[in-house]
């Protein structure tokens, strides 16, 4: 099987968020970066499928030069090779622009399966995976908690897979799909492995193919404003006799706090 995993570099959760002067994104020039956590689970699932069915795992990431940090990390964890879609404008690309850039790099590989994380930790729109499937012209399924692959017994692409989707209210859904396909992986689907010293050293010798991105396309989605929520705290003193105070408290909880 040839499995492609799309990964994204995001700021670390410990980094102190600062909004830029235009209030359209964060001021990330001095940020610390890490692999998007849902993508780490997608990578782990791909590595497990490779161990079971054979083949190779290719990681693809779109963004400026700094994304090679997470590409190297993915290679150290066990991916075989990588593709870097290089473009400074991709750092703040919307889902459509990002998916188009990824699709252009993935199509020539003709993969059996493409995995992405369910969503990114920084924006959380959960759109890139489904738009990517449309750009590649293959079926997709989202919020995946289990993957069972039945590869083709012949040469070339084919086969099918059975996936478990997480629904609302504790419900799950099993779906059977033909390959090739795109899946968006839910966090917690597996237990993550971490890079060993041998893996880190071996990653230095693995191929990272640099693919220049197409000229920047017009964004179809634009963030108009971003802000840090302010904390609002109000204290109200209820006076009167105990009976009067209790009656007033119940009224406040019902009408203002809507807690009862």
Predicted regions and their residues:
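N-terminal glycine-rich FAD/FM-binding segment characteristic of electron-transfer flavoproteins
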Residues: 1-260
């Amino acid at each position: 099987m040839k499995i492609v995993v799309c990964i994204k570099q995001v700021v670390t959760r410990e980094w102190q968020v600062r909004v830029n002067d235009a209030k359209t994104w964060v001021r990330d020039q001095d940020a610390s970066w890490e692999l998007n956590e849902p993508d780490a689970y997608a990578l782990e699932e791909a590595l497990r499928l490779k161990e079971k069915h054979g083949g190779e795992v290719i990681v693809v990431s779109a963004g400026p030069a700094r994304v090679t940090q997470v590409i190297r990390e993915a290679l150290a964890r066990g991916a075989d090779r990588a593709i870097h879609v290089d473009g400074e404008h991709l750092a703040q690309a919307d889902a459509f622009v990002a998916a188009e850039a990824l699709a252009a790099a993935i199509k020539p590989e003709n993969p059996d399966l493409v995995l992405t994380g369910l969503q990114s930790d920084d924006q959380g729109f959960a759109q890139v995976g489904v738009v990517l499937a449309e750009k590649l012209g293959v079926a997709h399924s989202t919020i995946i908690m289990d993957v069972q692959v039945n590869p083709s017994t012949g040469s070339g692409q084919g086969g099918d897979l059975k996936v478990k989707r997480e629904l609302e209210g504790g419900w799950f859904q099993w779906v059977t799909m033909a390959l090739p396909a795109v899946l968006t992986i839910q966090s917690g689907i597996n237990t993550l492995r971490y890079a060993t010293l041998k893996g880190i050293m071996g990653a230095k010798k693995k191929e990272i193919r640099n693919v220049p991105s197409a000229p920047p396309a017009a964004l179809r989605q634009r963030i108009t404003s971003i802000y840090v929520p302010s904390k609002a705290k109000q204290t109200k003193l209820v006076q009167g006799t105990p009976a009067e105070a209790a009656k007033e408290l119940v009224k406040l909880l019902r009408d203002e706090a809507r807690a009862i």
